[in-house]
Amino acid sequence: MIMRMTLTLFVLVVMTAASASGDALTEAKRVPYCGQTGAECYSWCKEQHLIRCCDFVKYVGMNPPADKCR
């Protein structure tokens, strides 16, 4: 009984952590337009106060600005 409850709690914690780490990518799926270029998309991402904007720009299929992303 305790083993089952522990396993359930563990699964809930892992699922919560995984969903929190993907916030920027989830936002990318919701937003259909963020600019014509990678630099515009990066600026839009920063205006939205999102984190991991370089990954966000790559995820939507653009090249992030070289001076901001490595």
UniProtKB/Swiss-Prot annotation:
<protein>
    <recommendedName>
        <fullName>Conotoxin Im23.4</fullName>
    </recommendedName>
</protein>
<comment type="similarity">
    <text>Belongs to the conotoxin K superfamily.</text>
</comment>
<keyword id="KW-1015">Disulfide bond</keyword>
<feature type="signal peptide">
    <location>
        <begin position="1"/>
        <end position="22"/>
    </location>
</feature>
<keyword id="KW-0964">Secreted</keyword>
<comment type="function">
    <text>Probable neurotoxin.</text>
</comment>
<feature type="disulfide bond">
    <location>
        <begin position="54"/>
        <end position="69"/>
    </location>
</feature>
<keyword id="KW-0165">Cleavage on pair of basic residues</keyword>
<keyword id="KW-0528">Neurotoxin</keyword>
<dbReference type="GO" id="GO:0005576">
    <property type="term" value="C:extracellular region"/>
</dbReference>
<feature type="disulfide bond">
    <location>
        <begin position="45"/>
        <end position="53"/>
    </location>
</feature>
<keyword id="KW-0800">Toxin</keyword>
<feature type="propeptide">
    <location>
        <begin position="23"/>
        <end position="30"/>
    </location>
</feature>
<feature type="disulfide bond">
    <location>
        <begin position="34"/>
        <end position="41"/>
    </location>
</feature>
<dbReference type="GO" id="GO:0090729">
    <property type="term" value="F:toxin activity"/>
</dbReference>
<keyword id="KW-0732">Signal</keyword>
